[in-house]
């Protein structure tokens, strides 16, 4: 299915329409096709792309609840708290433990992908379990 979508994206790449490859597994797909290459000289501790849960945002619900991700119950605070403290606090930090990703921690795309931890959570009730949509064989 991704291959068919990619063919359409390529067919219409010069049109005025921009196609967003938002799903994180596009990174793996494009990596395997040789379109995406991991740049040399990157910092090993930096997250460059992929799921942003815990990394650079949180969600504010209509009720003022702060969530690490909109796709599963990931409460980290409220808008009544100091946002700096919430962002750097232990509740949000638990989503930043990238070495805990069971499968992704061993993958060269860890800093660019990580699949969808919310899908993994929905499937296994474990945020750090493998995204069941990921086809990459590790090890």
For each predicted feature, which ranges?
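Short linker/helix segments within small regulatory modules
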Residues: 124-128
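C-terminal accessory region of radical SAM enzymes
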Residues: 1-40, 65-115, 121
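Short, acidic, Ser/Thr-enriched surface-loop or helix-capping motifs
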Residues: 60-61
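Acidic, His- and aromatic-enriched active-site or binding-groove loops in soluble protein domains
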Residues: 41-48
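Gly/Ser/Thr-rich beta-alpha loop segments that engage phosphate groups in nucleotides
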Residues: 56, 117
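Short Fe-S-cluster ligation motifs
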Residues: 104, 131-139
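Short, small/polar residue-rich loop motifs at catalytic or cofactor-binding pockets
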Residues: 51-55
């Amino acid at each position: 299915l991704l291959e068919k979508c990619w063919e359409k994206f390529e067919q219409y790449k010069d049109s005025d329409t921009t196609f967003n490859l938002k799903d994180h597994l596009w990174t793996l797909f494009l990596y395997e096709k040789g379109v995406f290459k991991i740049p040399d000289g990157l910092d090993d501790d930096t997250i460059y792309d992929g799921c942003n849960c815990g990394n650079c945002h949180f969600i504010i619900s209509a009720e003022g609840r702060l969530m690490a991700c909109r796709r599963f119950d990931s409460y980290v605070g409220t808008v009544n708290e100091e946002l700096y403290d919430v962002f750097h606090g232990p509740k949000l930090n638990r989503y930043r433990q990238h070495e805990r990703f069971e499968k992704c921690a061993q993958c060269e795309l860890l800093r660019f992908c990580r699949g969808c931890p919310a899908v993994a959570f929905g499937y296994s009730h474990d945020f750090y379990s493998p995204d069941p949509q990921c086809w990459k064989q590790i090890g």
